[in-house]
Amino acid sequence: MPSRGLIVFCALLGALILGWLAWRGFSSRRPLGEAPVPAIDKQPVAFASRTFDPDTLPADMPPLASGESAECDSQFLSSASVRGESRQTDATHATVTITQIKVTLQLNINIWVPTGVTQHVIEHEDGHRQISEYYYQTAGKLAERIAAPYMGKQVEITGTDLGAESNKMLQQIATDITDEYNKELNPGPTQLLYDAITDHGRNEVVVKDAVAHALKNITIESTQPTTNPGN
């Protein structure tokens, strides 16, 4: 029975991106010798398993592709807030030093199965969940690695409205951080390989074996199309 797991990234789901500016003379309040680090808030996985009537699909359920009867909808969300301190050199020039970065991460998983579905289909969709949660295990370290190089960075800004220019720059850094997080996280190829191994849940390959094989061999075996990961 065909099934589907949908990976949706935060950039397309309205992830909050905030830029904040502390517009004052630069003065460090951090103890001497302490290197600045970004703050990472990694939320627990939010998981729900839901059933539906195939003849009356719930309004909040993602659409099923043709021929599919169930799906695993995994949403990786991220938001970043960036703060800076400014040293103004004249009326139209300033240097902004990045002093604080906070990245918040979330993973929301919903498995949708029709009433009366077989246990085999449920297990297949749960395999997609396992893959998503595997990638999320190290998401905090990934976000920290991406955000860390921006800490302490000094950016020259110019303009007649230095406050607006500073906020624009901080917002762009926040966007760059979340965009890079989405790009590098990338569980899609592993989900595709898992579907190739299991024939989208149609064969009798044991789910735990398929998940383990996909996670181990993705770098050398993933040659599947890049559309609809998790089918």
What label would you give each PLM region?
Residues P36-T97, V103, Y150-N231:
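Metalloprotease/metallohydrolase-associated module, dominated by Zn2+-dependent proteases
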Residues G116-H120, R129:
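Active-site alpha-helix of zinc metalloproteases
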Residues T99-I101, L105-L107, I111:
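Early exported N-terminus immediately downstream of N-terminal targeting peptides
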Residues M1-G5:
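Positively charged n-region of N-terminal signal peptides that target proteins for export
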Residues V8-L21:
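Hydrophobic membrane-insertion alpha-helices, especially the h-region
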Residues D126-E144:
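Catalytic Zn2+-binding segment of zinc metalloproteases
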Residues G19-P31:
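Membrane-interface motif at the C-terminal end of an N-terminal transmembrane signal
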